[in-house]
Protein backbone atom coordinates (compact mmCIF):
# COMPACT_ATOMS: atom_id res chain seq x y z
CA UNK A 1 0.00 0.00 0.00
CA UNK A 2 1.37 3.39 -1.02
CA UNK A 3 1.01 6.20 1.50
CA UNK A 4 -0.86 9.16 0.04
CA UNK A 5 0.03 12.72 1.02
CA UNK A 6 -2.79 15.21 1.60
CA UNK A 7 -3.21 17.85 -1.16
CA UNK A 8 -0.48 20.49 -1.15
CA UNK A 9 -3.08 23.25 -1.09
CA UNK A 10 -4.00 21.98 2.38
CA UNK A 11 -0.48 21.24 3.58
CA UNK A 12 0.95 24.56 2.40
CA UNK A 13 -1.44 26.42 4.68
CA UNK A 14 -0.30 24.32 7.65
CA UNK A 15 3.38 24.67 6.77
CA UNK A 16 3.07 28.45 6.40
CA UNK A 17 1.61 28.68 9.91
CA UNK A 18 4.28 26.43 11.42
CA UNK A 19 7.05 28.44 9.76
CA UNK A 20 5.52 31.69 10.98
CA UNK A 21 5.31 30.26 14.49
CA UNK A 22 9.06 29.62 14.49
CA UNK A 23 10.30 32.59 12.46
CA UNK A 24 8.14 35.24 14.11
CA UNK A 25 9.56 38.67 13.22
CA UNK A 26 12.58 37.08 11.56
CA UNK A 27 15.47 34.69 12.13
CA UNK A 28 17.76 37.05 14.05
CA UNK A 29 20.80 34.79 13.93
CA UNK A 30 20.70 33.76 10.30
CA UNK A 31 19.76 37.19 8.94
CA UNK A 32 22.68 38.74 10.81
CA UNK A 33 25.11 36.18 9.41
CA UNK A 34 23.85 36.02 5.83
CA UNK A 35 21.95 38.71 3.92
CA UNK A 36 19.04 37.10 2.09
CA UNK A 37 20.06 34.85 -0.80
CA UNK A 38 23.73 35.84 -0.47
CA UNK A 39 25.56 32.60 0.41
CA UNK A 40 24.87 29.11 -0.91
CA UNK A 41 25.97 25.74 0.37
CA UNK A 42 24.99 22.14 0.93
CA UNK A 43 23.84 20.05 3.85
CA UNK A 44 22.83 16.50 4.60
CA UNK A 45 20.30 14.85 6.86
CA UNK A 46 21.59 11.99 8.98
CA UNK A 47 19.76 9.29 10.94
CA UNK A 48 20.99 9.12 14.54
CA UNK A 49 19.08 5.96 15.49
CA UNK A 50 17.48 3.10 13.57
CA UNK A 51 13.94 3.71 12.36
CA UNK A 52 11.45 4.00 9.52
CA UNK A 53 11.75 7.25 7.58
CA UNK A 54 8.64 9.34 6.90
CA UNK A 55 8.11 12.98 5.97
CA UNK A 56 10.86 13.70 3.45
CA UNK A 57 8.44 15.16 0.85
CA UNK A 58 7.04 17.40 3.58
CA UNK A 59 10.52 18.55 4.57
CA UNK A 60 11.24 19.33 0.91
CA UNK A 61 8.08 21.42 0.69
CA UNK A 62 8.92 23.25 3.92
CA UNK A 63 12.28 24.38 2.60
CA UNK A 64 10.85 25.32 -0.80
CA UNK A 65 8.35 27.67 0.82
CA UNK A 66 11.43 29.62 1.94
CA UNK A 67 13.46 29.16 -1.26
CA UNK A 68 11.74 27.74 -4.33
CA UNK A 69 15.12 27.06 -5.95
CA UNK A 70 16.44 24.99 -3.06
CA UNK A 71 17.27 21.37 -3.94
CA UNK A 72 16.20 18.67 -1.46
CA UNK A 73 17.08 15.22 -2.76
CA UNK A 74 15.98 12.21 -0.68
CA UNK A 75 18.57 9.45 -0.57
CA UNK A 76 16.08 6.83 0.64
CA UNK A 77 12.41 6.14 -0.16
CA UNK A 78 9.62 6.87 2.29
CA UNK A 79 9.08 3.89 4.55
CA UNK A 80 12.63 2.58 4.47
CA UNK A 81 14.03 1.15 7.68
CA UNK A 82 17.32 3.04 8.08
CA UNK A 83 20.22 2.45 10.40
CA UNK A 84 22.15 4.91 12.54
CA UNK A 85 24.52 7.02 10.46
CA UNK A 86 22.69 6.72 7.13
CA UNK A 87 22.34 9.86 5.03
CA UNK A 88 18.68 10.25 4.09
CA UNK A 89 18.73 13.56 2.20
CA UNK A 90 21.14 15.90 0.41
CA UNK A 91 20.24 19.59 0.33
CA UNK A 92 21.68 22.56 -1.54
CA UNK A 93 20.59 26.17 -1.61
CA UNK A 94 20.84 29.50 0.15
CA UNK A 95 22.05 29.25 3.73
CA UNK A 96 19.29 31.54 4.98
CA UNK A 97 16.60 29.09 3.81
CA UNK A 98 18.55 26.05 5.00
CA UNK A 99 19.05 27.41 8.50
CA UNK A 100 15.69 29.13 8.92
CA UNK A 101 13.70 26.10 7.79
CA UNK A 102 15.86 23.49 9.52
CA UNK A 103 13.92 23.15 12.77
CA UNK A 104 10.40 22.99 11.35
CA UNK A 105 11.41 20.53 8.64
CA UNK A 106 13.30 18.31 11.07
CA UNK A 107 10.58 18.45 13.72
CA UNK A 108 7.99 17.20 11.26
CA UNK A 109 10.19 14.45 9.84
CA UNK A 110 11.26 13.30 13.31
CA UNK A 111 7.66 13.17 14.55
CA UNK A 112 6.38 11.33 11.47
CA UNK A 113 9.31 8.92 11.37
CA UNK A 114 8.70 8.03 15.01
CA UNK A 115 5.07 7.22 14.22
CA UNK A 116 6.00 5.19 11.14
CA UNK A 117 8.62 3.27 13.13
CA UNK A 118 6.20 2.18 15.86
CA UNK A 119 3.44 1.49 13.34
CA UNK A 120 5.70 -0.92 11.47
CA UNK A 121 6.44 -2.79 14.70
CA UNK A 122 2.70 -3.35 15.19
CA UNK A 123 2.15 -4.30 11.55
CA UNK A 124 5.04 -6.77 11.58
CA UNK A 125 3.43 -8.64 14.49
CA UNK A 126 0.39 -9.51 12.37
CA UNK A 127 1.84 -9.44 8.85
CA UNK A 128 1.04 -13.11 8.15
CA UNK A 129 -2.58 -12.90 9.34
CA UNK A 130 -5.67 -11.71 7.38
CA UNK A 131 -6.20 -8.60 9.48
CA UNK A 132 -5.55 -4.89 8.94
CA UNK A 133 -4.15 -2.44 11.48
CA UNK A 134 -6.01 0.89 11.47
CA UNK A 135 -5.35 4.16 13.29
CA UNK A 136 -7.77 6.37 15.23
CA UNK A 137 -8.76 10.02 15.69
CA UNK A 138 -6.50 10.33 18.74
CA UNK A 139 -4.13 12.70 16.99
CA UNK A 140 -2.34 15.94 17.81
CA UNK A 141 -4.57 18.92 16.93
CA UNK A 142 -3.29 20.45 13.70
CA UNK A 143 -1.19 17.40 12.82
CA UNK A 144 -3.86 14.82 12.03
CA UNK A 145 -3.31 14.72 8.27
CA UNK A 146 0.43 14.21 8.67
CA UNK A 147 0.24 11.80 11.60
CA UNK A 148 -2.22 9.63 9.71
CA UNK A 149 0.03 9.82 6.65
CA UNK A 150 2.85 8.49 8.84
CA UNK A 151 0.78 5.49 9.96
CA UNK A 152 0.25 4.68 6.28
CA UNK A 153 4.00 4.85 5.69
CA UNK A 154 4.41 2.36 8.53
CA UNK A 155 1.94 -0.04 6.91
CA UNK A 156 -1.36 0.74 8.64
CA UNK A 157 -4.64 1.88 7.12
CA UNK A 158 -6.43 5.08 8.02
CA UNK A 159 -9.65 4.87 9.99
CA UNK A 160 -11.91 7.94 9.86
CA UNK A 161 -10.03 11.13 9.03
CA UNK A 162 -12.80 13.08 10.73
CA UNK A 163 -16.36 12.93 11.98
CA UNK A 164 -17.68 13.46 8.46
CA UNK A 165 -16.12 10.29 7.02
CA UNK A 166 -18.50 7.69 8.41
CA UNK A 167 -20.93 7.01 11.23
CA UNK A 168 -19.45 5.49 14.37
CA UNK A 169 -21.90 4.93 17.20
CA UNK A 170 -19.84 4.92 20.40
CA UNK A 171 -20.77 4.26 24.01
CA UNK A 172 -21.73 7.86 24.75
CA UNK A 173 -23.90 8.08 21.62
CA UNK A 174 -25.64 4.88 22.73
CA UNK A 175 -26.16 6.20 26.25
CA UNK A 176 -27.48 9.53 24.98
CA UNK A 177 -29.83 7.91 22.44
CA UNK A 178 -31.18 5.32 24.87
CA UNK A 179 -29.64 2.22 23.30
CA UNK A 180 -28.09 0.74 20.16
CA UNK A 181 -31.43 0.09 18.46
CA UNK A 182 -32.61 3.64 19.08
CA UNK A 183 -29.34 5.15 17.90
CA UNK A 184 -29.24 3.18 14.63
CA UNK A 185 -32.91 3.96 13.88
CA UNK A 186 -32.35 7.69 14.32
CA UNK A 187 -29.18 7.65 12.25
CA UNK A 188 -30.66 5.69 9.33
CA UNK A 189 -33.36 8.32 8.97
CA UNK A 190 -30.89 11.14 8.44
CA UNK A 191 -27.56 10.05 6.92
CA UNK A 192 -26.70 9.86 3.20
CA UNK A 193 -27.13 6.28 2.01
CA UNK A 194 -23.45 5.61 1.06
CA UNK A 195 -22.24 6.13 4.64
CA UNK A 196 -21.48 3.00 6.63
CA UNK A 197 -22.58 2.59 10.22
CA UNK A 198 -20.13 1.23 12.77
CA UNK A 199 -21.34 0.37 16.26
CA UNK A 200 -19.20 -0.01 19.36
CA UNK A 201 -20.12 -2.99 21.54
CA UNK A 202 -18.87 -4.26 24.88
CA UNK A 203 -21.11 -7.29 25.47
CA UNK A 204 -22.51 -10.19 23.45
CA UNK A 205 -26.01 -8.77 23.93
CA UNK A 206 -24.90 -5.53 22.29
CA UNK A 207 -23.33 -7.52 19.44
CA UNK A 208 -26.67 -9.28 18.87
CA UNK A 209 -28.52 -5.95 18.84
CA UNK A 210 -26.06 -4.41 16.39
CA UNK A 211 -26.50 -7.42 14.09
CA UNK A 212 -30.27 -7.29 14.35
CA UNK A 213 -30.27 -3.64 13.29
CA UNK A 214 -27.87 -4.23 10.42
CA UNK A 215 -24.75 -2.39 11.46
CA UNK A 216 -22.10 -2.50 8.73
CA UNK A 217 -19.13 -2.74 11.11
CA UNK A 218 -19.19 -4.00 14.68
CA UNK A 219 -16.44 -2.87 17.02
CA UNK A 220 -15.55 -5.17 19.90
CA UNK A 221 -14.33 -2.70 22.49
CA UNK A 222 -12.18 -3.72 25.45
CA UNK A 223 -13.36 -7.33 25.32
CA UNK A 224 -11.36 -10.21 26.74
CA UNK A 225 -9.91 -12.57 24.14
CA UNK A 226 -12.43 -15.26 25.07
CA UNK A 227 -15.37 -12.88 24.76
CA UNK A 228 -13.95 -11.57 21.50
CA UNK A 229 -13.78 -15.08 20.05
CA UNK A 230 -17.41 -15.68 21.03
CA UNK A 231 -18.48 -12.41 19.44
CA UNK A 232 -16.63 -13.20 16.20
CA UNK A 233 -18.31 -16.63 16.05
CA UNK A 234 -21.77 -15.10 16.52
CA UNK A 235 -21.20 -12.46 13.85
CA UNK A 236 -19.71 -14.90 11.31
CA UNK A 237 -22.59 -17.31 11.85
CA UNK A 238 -25.23 -14.67 11.19
CA UNK A 239 -23.59 -12.48 8.52
CA UNK A 240 -20.83 -12.70 5.97
CA UNK A 241 -21.28 -8.99 5.22
CA UNK A 242 -20.50 -7.41 8.57
CA UNK A 243 -16.90 -6.42 9.22
CA UNK A 244 -15.43 -6.83 12.70
CA UNK A 245 -13.07 -4.42 14.42
CA UNK A 246 -11.27 -4.97 17.71
CA UNK A 247 -10.21 -2.03 19.82
CA UNK A 248 -9.01 -1.14 23.29
CA UNK A 249 -5.74 -1.71 25.15
CA UNK A 250 -3.95 -3.14 22.11
CA UNK A 251 -0.21 -3.42 22.72
CA UNK A 252 2.75 -4.98 20.94
CA UNK A 253 2.42 -7.88 23.36
CA UNK A 254 -1.30 -8.47 22.76
CA UNK A 255 -1.92 -7.54 19.13
CA UNK A 256 -1.19 -10.98 17.70
CA UNK A 257 -3.55 -12.70 20.12
CA UNK A 258 -6.25 -10.19 19.19
CA UNK A 259 -5.63 -10.82 15.48
CA UNK A 260 -5.93 -14.58 15.98
CA UNK A 261 -9.53 -14.20 17.20
CA UNK A 262 -10.56 -13.69 13.57
CA UNK A 263 -11.37 -9.99 13.46
CA UNK A 264 -10.98 -8.02 10.22
CA UNK A 265 -9.47 -4.87 11.71
CA UNK A 266 -7.56 -3.87 14.82
CA UNK A 267 -7.67 -0.20 15.73
CA UNK A 268 -5.22 1.43 18.10
CA UNK A 269 -3.99 4.92 18.84
CA UNK A 270 -0.65 3.61 20.13
CA UNK A 271 1.53 4.33 17.05
CA UNK A 272 0.57 7.99 17.34
CA UNK A 273 0.06 8.48 21.08
CA UNK A 274 2.90 6.28 22.34
CA UNK A 275 5.58 6.83 19.71
CA UNK A 276 8.73 8.85 20.31
CA UNK A 277 10.45 11.11 17.80
CA UNK A 278 13.12 9.50 15.65
CA UNK A 279 16.42 11.31 16.12
CA UNK A 280 17.53 13.04 12.90
CA UNK A 281 19.99 15.88 12.35
CA UNK A 282 21.11 18.28 9.63
CA UNK A 283 24.80 18.97 9.06
CA UNK A 284 26.05 21.87 6.93
CA UNK A 285 29.00 21.05 4.68
CA UNK A 286 31.25 24.00 5.54
CA UNK A 287 33.62 23.43 2.60
CA UNK A 288 30.81 24.00 0.07
CA UNK A 289 30.13 27.61 1.10
CA UNK A 290 30.06 30.04 -1.83
CA UNK A 291 28.42 33.34 -2.89
CA UNK A 292 24.96 32.81 -4.36
CA UNK A 293 24.88 32.42 -8.11
CA UNK A 294 28.57 31.51 -8.41
Across the structure, where does each feature detected by a protein language model lie?
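Short, low-complexity, intrinsically disordered N-terminal peptides in bacterial proteins
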Residues: 1-9, 287-294
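Cys/His-rich Zn2+-binding cysteine-cluster or related metal-binding knuckle/ribbon modules and their
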Residues: 252
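Acidic/glycine-rich phosphate/pyrophosphate-binding loops and surrounding catalytic core
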Residues: 2-213, 217, 226-234, 243-245, ...
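Short glycine/threonine-rich catalytic loop with a Thr-x-Gly-x-Asp
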Residues: 245-247, 282
Amino acid sequence: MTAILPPWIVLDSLLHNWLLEDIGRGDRTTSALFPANSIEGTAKWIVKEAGVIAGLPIADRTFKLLDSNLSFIPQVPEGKLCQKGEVIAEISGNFDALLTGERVALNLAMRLSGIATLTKKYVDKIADLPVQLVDTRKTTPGLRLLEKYATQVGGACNHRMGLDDAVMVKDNHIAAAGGIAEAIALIRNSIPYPLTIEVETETLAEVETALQHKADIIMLDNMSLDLMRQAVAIIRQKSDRVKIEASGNVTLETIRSVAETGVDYISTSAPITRSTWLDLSMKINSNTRSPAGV
